[in-house]
């Protein structure tokens, strides 16, 4: 009883911002590092003796449907954070990869890329899919729009980018390891959620991405524990400063939509690599607000 009262006083009076950090920084970090992920709920409870216990529920978007990825349990004691991940599938399978434009040698992956397009060609019309594509160079978000428009043209509901591979200058591009796991570098989702974190006012998508990077770089210890990466792997401050100087540019995206529409990307001169994620039955229609899988 006394421990619970002390915890409430600690978080609510002296450290309300600390509670927000324990609750909302992990959610922001997960959406930035797990491909095509979105936090849909969960909560954080203050427990005895300065501890908190929280759960974050993650989903992914394939077509217009949301499908459970898993749950991340986060327990904190003062500034220490413990993380436990439980995936909907026994082990979360990483099928989405990117290739940085600096990587020149792609010979070993030509057969894999060919199989991606063949799969999209062979699967039935009534399906939607998730696809990671890499571009021939890094593009601003404004430059990306006409590239996608040239592929899909005017449609009421064209395939939708849901996650972006951000060029931070630190991507591990080499000829002996050309593909970069989508867990390895900084990304950002289509919709960035700051929760109740104190943030600067932003007006553009680019400003929003920079603000996300600023917030995460200021909480590197929490991000490190939540994403289970080392400071050397994250290097958040260095990535933030690079993007702040060079601007928001992306060299790949995760995009979802009707399988046959995604197949059109095969003919784009700007697409140099493709990896296929999940395939689901047709759901390419707008759902009533609040509807979820």
Q: Where do the language-model regions lie?
A:
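Hydrophobic membrane-insertion alpha-helices, especially the h-region
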Residues: 1-8
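Generic low-polarity alpha-helical segments
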Residues: 2, 153-157, 238-241
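Ser/Thr/Pro/Gly-rich low-complexity linker/stalk segments immediately outside membranes or between
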Residues: 13-27
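Context-gated lysine
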Residues: 18-20, 60, 64, 68, ...
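Short extracytoplasmic
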Residues: 26-58
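Hydrophobic transmembrane signal anchors and adjacent membrane-proximal interface regions, especially
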Residues: 56, 164, 168, 185, ...
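Extracytoplasmic beta-rich ectodomain segments of secreted or membrane-anchored proteins
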Residues: 63-196
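Extracytoplasmic/luminal low-complexity segments enriched in Pro/Gly and acidic/polar residues
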Residues: 200-293
């Amino acid at each position: 009883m006394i421990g619970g009262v002390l915890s409430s006083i600690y978080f609510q009076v002296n450290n309300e911002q600390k509670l927000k950090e324990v609750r909302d920084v992990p959610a922001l970090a997960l959406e930035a590092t797990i491909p095509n992920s979105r936090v849909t709920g969960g909560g954080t409870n203050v427990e005895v003796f300065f501890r908190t216990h929280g759960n974050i529920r993650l989903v992914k978007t394939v077509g217009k449907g949301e499908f459970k990825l898993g749950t991340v349990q986060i327990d904190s004691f003062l500034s220490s954070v413990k993380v436990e991940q439980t995936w909907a599938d026994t082990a979360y399978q990483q099928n989405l990869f990117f290739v940085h434009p600096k990587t020149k040698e792609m010979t070993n992956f030509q057969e894999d890329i060919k199989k991606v397009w063949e799969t999209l060609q062979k699967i039935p019309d009534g399906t939607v899919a998730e696809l990671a594509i890499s571009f021939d160079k890094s593009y601003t978000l404004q430059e990306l729009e006409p590239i996608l428009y040239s592929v899909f043209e005017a449609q009421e509901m064209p395939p939708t980018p849901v996650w972006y591979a951000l060029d931070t200058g630190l991507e591990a591009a080499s000829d002996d390891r050309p593909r970069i796991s989508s867990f390895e570098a900084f990304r950002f989702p289509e919709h960035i959620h700051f929760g109740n974190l104190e943030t600067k006012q932003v007006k553009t998508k680019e400003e929003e991405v920079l603000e996300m990077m600023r917030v995460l770089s200021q909480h590197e210890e929490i991000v490190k524990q939540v994403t289970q990466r080392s400071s050397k792997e994250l290097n958040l401050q260095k990535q933030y400063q690079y993007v702040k100087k060079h601007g928001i540019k992306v060299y790949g995206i995760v995009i979802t939509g009707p399988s046959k529409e995604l197949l059109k990307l095969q003919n784009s001169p700007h697409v140099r690599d493709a990896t296929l994620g999940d395939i689901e039955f047709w759901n390419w229609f707008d759902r009533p607000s609040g509807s979820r899988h």
